[in-house]
Amino acid sequence: MRKPRTSEVTAYLQSDIKFVWNVVTNNNDYKWRSDVEKIEIINDGKEFIEYTPNGIATKFFITKKEEYSQYEFSMGNKMFTGFWTGHFSETENGETKIVFVENIFIRNPIIKILSYFFMDLKKMQNTYILDLKKKLGEQ
């Protein structure tokens, strides 16, 4: 079996878990994300297509949505397939802990090698967290 490229990010947010959950799972409100030009929602919201500012389209299929706890989807485009898992939990002091794990399988072995240079998963995840904190009013 092919080995995925994997990246994990953990963040602690001052906002209530319900607020964080609603922001992350609401694909109709995406303007706060600097990495997305537009999102097209299809199949009654079970699927969506994200378009980057460069015009790259990635299709997502929501596979699990346990309110305030876990959000999962598979994803793919012409370059890769993969899956993403988001875990949400409330801390003792009322903050929200999020753990996002992304696993991608690059279709072409040569592109996989090059992807370490032009597709920095950790940087992409950190950009998302920074954008999320701004949306939540935490920065």
PLM regions: where:
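Hydrophobic-ligand binding "helix-grip"
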Residues: 53-99, 103-107
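Short, Lys/Arg-enriched, disordered terminal segments
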Residues: 1-6, 92, 134-139
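Short, structured interface segments that constitute the first stable element of a domain
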Residues: 39-60, 127-129
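Residue-level marker for the onset of beta-strands and adjacent loop->beta junctions
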Residues: 7-9, 35, 44-47, 58-59, ...
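A conserved amphipathic terminal alpha-helix motif
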Residues: 104-139
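Hydrophobic ligand-binding cavity/cleft-lining segments
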Residues: 1-40
